[in-house]
Amino acid sequence: MKLSRKESVQRRHRRIRKKVNGTPNCPRLAVFRSNLHIYAQIIDDVGQHTIAAASTVEPDLKKSLSSGSTCEASAAVGKLVAERALAQGIEQVVFDRGGNLYHGRVKALADAAREAGLQF
Protein backbone atom coordinates (compact mmCIF):
# COMPACT_ATOMS: atom_id res chain seq x y z
CA MET A 1 0.00 0.00 0.00
CA LYS A 2 1.32 3.42 -0.96
CA LEU A 3 2.05 5.85 1.87
CA SER A 4 0.28 9.18 1.95
CA ARG A 5 2.34 12.37 1.88
CA LYS A 6 1.73 12.94 5.61
CA GLU A 7 2.83 9.40 6.48
CA SER A 8 5.97 9.79 4.36
CA VAL A 9 6.86 13.03 6.14
CA GLN A 10 6.28 11.46 9.57
CA ARG A 11 8.39 8.42 8.72
CA ARG A 12 11.20 10.61 7.35
CA HIS A 13 11.02 12.84 10.46
CA ARG A 14 11.41 9.86 12.82
CA ARG A 15 14.45 8.70 10.85
CA ILE A 16 16.02 12.19 10.92
CA ARG A 17 15.40 12.69 14.65
CA LYS A 18 17.47 9.60 15.45
CA LYS A 19 20.50 11.44 14.04
CA VAL A 20 19.78 15.14 14.75
CA ASN A 21 19.98 16.26 18.37
CA GLY A 22 20.27 19.75 19.85
CA THR A 23 22.64 20.60 22.69
CA PRO A 24 22.97 23.80 24.75
CA ASN A 25 26.01 24.80 22.66
CA CYS A 26 24.48 23.83 19.31
CA PRO A 27 20.66 23.66 19.55
CA ARG A 28 18.29 22.33 16.91
CA LEU A 29 16.44 24.60 14.48
CA ALA A 30 13.20 22.64 14.01
CA VAL A 31 10.85 23.51 11.16
CA PHE A 32 7.18 22.54 10.95
CA ARG A 33 5.33 23.24 7.72
CA SER A 34 1.56 23.13 7.45
CA ASN A 35 -0.57 23.98 4.44
CA LEU A 36 -1.26 27.52 5.68
CA HIS A 37 1.66 28.41 7.96
CA ILE A 38 5.28 27.68 8.83
CA TYR A 39 6.80 27.45 12.31
CA ALA A 40 10.44 27.49 13.43
CA GLN A 41 11.81 26.76 16.90
CA ILE A 42 15.32 26.67 18.29
CA ILE A 43 15.33 23.81 20.79
CA ASP A 44 17.80 22.56 23.39
CA ASP A 45 17.01 18.83 23.53
CA VAL A 46 19.22 18.21 26.58
CA GLY A 47 17.47 20.85 28.69
CA GLN A 48 14.17 20.15 26.92
CA HIS A 49 13.21 23.78 26.36
CA THR A 50 12.65 26.16 23.48
CA ILE A 51 15.19 28.97 23.24
CA ALA A 52 13.55 30.99 20.45
CA ALA A 53 10.57 30.60 18.15
CA ALA A 54 8.82 32.34 15.26
CA SER A 55 5.90 31.57 12.99
CA THR A 56 3.55 33.11 10.47
CA VAL A 57 0.69 33.10 13.01
CA GLU A 58 2.32 35.87 15.08
CA PRO A 59 0.16 39.01 14.78
CA ASP A 60 2.95 41.46 13.86
CA LEU A 61 4.32 39.14 11.17
CA LYS A 62 0.87 38.16 9.93
CA LYS A 63 -0.05 41.81 9.24
CA SER A 64 2.95 42.36 6.99
CA LEU A 65 2.41 39.20 4.91
CA SER A 66 -0.22 38.57 2.26
CA SER A 67 -0.19 34.82 2.98
CA GLY A 68 1.49 32.54 5.49
CA SER A 69 2.11 29.81 2.94
CA THR A 70 4.59 31.49 0.59
CA CYS A 71 8.37 31.39 0.31
CA GLU A 72 8.37 35.10 1.20
CA ALA A 73 6.60 34.32 4.49
CA SER A 74 9.04 31.49 5.20
CA ALA A 75 11.99 33.82 4.63
CA ALA A 76 10.49 36.34 7.06
CA VAL A 77 10.13 33.61 9.71
CA GLY A 78 13.71 32.45 9.10
CA LYS A 79 15.05 35.96 9.53
CA LEU A 80 12.98 36.55 12.68
CA VAL A 81 13.97 33.29 14.39
CA ALA A 82 17.63 33.97 13.57
CA GLU A 83 17.44 37.45 15.09
CA ARG A 84 15.84 36.05 18.25
CA ALA A 85 18.48 33.32 18.50
CA LEU A 86 21.33 35.78 18.07
CA ALA A 87 19.79 37.94 20.82
CA GLN A 88 19.99 34.86 23.10
CA GLY A 89 23.64 34.32 22.13
CA ILE A 90 23.05 31.35 19.80
CA GLU A 91 25.07 31.43 16.57
CA GLN A 92 25.53 27.73 15.69
CA VAL A 93 22.53 25.42 15.19
CA VAL A 94 21.67 22.02 13.69
CA PHE A 95 18.95 22.19 11.02
CA ASP A 96 15.99 19.82 11.44
CA ARG A 97 13.77 20.02 8.36
CA GLY A 98 11.04 18.05 10.10
CA GLY A 99 10.74 15.32 7.49
CA ASN A 100 9.99 17.83 4.73
CA LEU A 101 12.09 17.94 1.61
CA TYR A 102 14.77 20.65 1.55
CA HIS A 103 13.00 22.60 -1.17
CA GLY A 104 10.63 25.53 -1.48
CA ARG A 105 9.42 27.01 1.80
CA VAL A 106 11.82 24.98 3.98
CA LYS A 107 14.80 26.03 1.86
CA ALA A 108 13.65 29.68 1.88
CA LEU A 109 13.50 29.64 5.70
CA ALA A 110 16.96 28.06 5.96
CA ASP A 111 18.52 30.52 3.50
CA ALA A 112 17.03 33.52 5.31
CA ALA A 113 18.25 32.23 8.69
CA ARG A 114 21.77 31.82 7.26
CA GLU A 115 21.71 35.33 5.79
CA ALA A 116 20.60 36.72 9.17
CA GLY A 117 23.67 35.20 10.86
CA LEU A 118 22.90 31.65 11.98
CA GLN A 119 25.47 29.02 11.04
CA PHE A 120 24.48 25.48 10.03
Curated annotation (Swiss-Prot):
- Give the family per the record: Belongs to the universal ribosomal protein uL18 family.
Give the protein's biological function. Answer: This is one of the proteins that bind and probably mediate the attachment of the 5S RNA into the large ribosomal subunit, where it forms part of the central protuberance.
Pfam families reported in the protein's UniProt record: Ribosomal_L18p (PF00861)
* InterPro entries registered for this protein in UniProt: Ribosomal_uL18_bac-type (IPR004389), Ribosomal_uL18_bac/euk (IPR005484)
- Which N-terminal stretch is annotated as signal sequence? none
Membrane-spanning segments: none
Q: Give the SUPFAM superfamilies listed for this entry.
A: Translational machinery components (SSF53137)
User: Which terms under GO biological process does the entry name?
Assistant: translation
**UniProt keyword Electron transport, yes or no:** no
Q: Which UniProt keywords apply?
A: Ribonucleoprotein, Ribosomal protein, RNA-binding, rRNA-binding
From the UniProt record, which GO molecular function terms apply? 5S rRNA binding; structural constituent of ribosome
* UniProt keyword Ribosomal protein present: yes
Q: Which CDD domains match?
A: Ribosomal_L18_L5e
- Chain's gene name: rplR
- Gene Ontology cellular component terms for the protein in this record: cytosolic large ribosomal subunit
Superkingdom to which the source organism belongs: Bacteria
- Describe its assembly: Part of the 50S ribosomal subunit; part of the 5S rRNA/L5/L18/L25 subcomplex. Contacts the 5S and 23S rRNAs.
Protein name in the entry? Large ribosomal subunit protein uL18
